[in-house]
Amino acid sequence: MADEAGTRSAGGRPIPAAEPLRPALSRQRSQGAVHLRVAPAGTAADAPTRIVDLAESGPLRLRCPRQGAERMLEGVLVNTGGGIACGDVFTVSVTVEPGGACVLTTTAAEKIYRSDGPCAEIVNRASVGAGGRLDWLPQETILFDRARLVRRFEADLAPDASLLVAEIAVLGRAARGESLEQALFEDRWRIRRDGRLVYADSLRLDGAVTALMNRRAIGGGARALATILDLSLRAEGRLDEARALLDALPAQVEAGASAWNGHLAVRMLAPTVAPLRDAAARFLAAWRGQPMPRVWQT
């Protein structure tokens, strides 16, 4: 028997109507972005570079610890969220106007957390005008087990612009004895000079990444890898200098350099991140002829 209050039980007590099903909670995705434009503060050859435009959104921020008379502006990217989770999308774009000079780094290692399916995405874009220079020197990226990361670096350079890029990837948290039993790391670089593609590089590690890196023909047991790329007018002619610097690195770091098509590339592999990070910092400081950004030393 029923009335407007709802269905009644056999004892005559009303049975409350069932509440509608609530939709399953969806995981909150984070979208962060920094869009930066810098230019010289004057026409002198040694005029310091200053920020012209800056837009920030989500957890990404930019800080400039040094705003002195130095020609090169130093910027530090900060992820206030502390890491990158599945489905997050982080975008950084930087424009260096003609004659400007800028070095960008990160405040700490970037952590890529385990994923329940979707990939995290990092998109970095750069444009460097005539006579400009950009040094892209983030600290290492650490992938947790079951992390899924797709990263892209794209740059457009004027005919006489300079670009130096260094990226370090760490496959698992060695301090915890972690291996990547299941993960995805896809890294895609595309560099154009005067509109023409001059450098293209793609890496894809998918599945049992640690097992893949244990293969002699792939990683020889390495858990940390670095790529350093110099696209400047003198880079190709400095190959012997680069190899001499690499020969002085510790034995546990395997490294090689090659130069062609107006640029120079360095690869490094190591069983753990500490010696590789130190080796990359030593090489870059000598190569650039100036110290690494201060956050690298903390």
Swiss-Prot record:
Disulfide bonds: none annotated. Keywords: Chaperone, Cytoplasm, Nickel insertion. Signal peptide: none annotated. InterPro entries: UreD. GO terms for molecular function: nickel cation binding. Belongs to the UreD family. Required for maturation of urease via the functional incorporation of the urease nickel metallocenter. UreD, UreF and UreG form a complex that acts as a GTP-hydrolysis-dependent molecular chaperone, activating the urease apoprotein by helping to assemble the nickel containing metallocenter of UreC. The UreE protein probably delivers the nickel. This is Urease accessory protein UreD 3. The lineage of its organism: Bacteria, Pseudomonadati, Pseudomonadota, Alphaproteobacteria, Hyphomicrobiales.
